[in-house]
Amino acid sequence: MRITLALVTGTMLLAGPVAAADWKLLTFPDQGFGIESPVPLVKGAGTYQAAVAGRIPTVTYSGELDNIRYKVTIIDISKRPAEALNLFEEMEALTELQGKVIGNDSMGIEPGKLRQYGRELVLQAKDGSFRRIGLMYSKGKIFQAEGTVLPGGDRESIYPERFADSIIFDLDPKRREERCADPNNFKTPEGK
């Protein structure tokens, strides 16, 4: 009995869960951002179109693994600084129309004084996909980091959230490490 139990347990341990994806920080200095991804992201192009924004060319980086699509879309609005807030809000509003909104919350990245805030949306899309989208504005660009569980994929996966929340704009690893090591960078204004 003990031998059988040991063999069954050993077999289960050896089989184990599917190996977790190997996540890496990918940096794109030409666009001024970095993001963690389990797959290489391939550069592409597209067009963002909206009533206020009009037609704006986009740069995209995307990849797919295990029925999850990872994509970053960059919209350069640096020539329209006076409209930045309105264009950001328009993008958020139009994104919400792409499915049933399950969540819409603020998100913050980078610790300390370099902290930046944006929006995070969770949608059940009309095509059955489950989308987690981080919208951030930095240095004249709107960044949309999106992890999408495609129809038939694992909706319980944490990977879309990890991807969307991992975007960074400070590409200096030493400076990031120093900021992350300083406990004062994680206190509230009241010092808590």
Where are these regions (language model features)?
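Positively charged n-region of N-terminal signal peptides that target proteins for export
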Residues: M1-T4
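Bacterial N-terminal signal peptides
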Residues: A6-A15
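Sec/Tat signal peptide C-region and signal peptidase I cleavage site
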Residues: G16-A20
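Short N-terminal segments immediately surrounding and downstream of signal-peptide cleavage
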Residues: A21-P40, F186
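Signature of long, low-cysteine stretches enriched in small and polar/charged residues
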Residues: E36-T60, E92-S138
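Surface-exposed amphipathic alpha-helical segments
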Residues: L41-V42, L87-V101, K141-K192
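Short acidic, Gly/Pro-enriched loop/turn segments at secondary-structure junctions
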Residues: T47-T58, A84, K174-P183
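A short acidic-to-branched-hydrophobic micro-motif
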Residues: T58-F88, Q144-E146
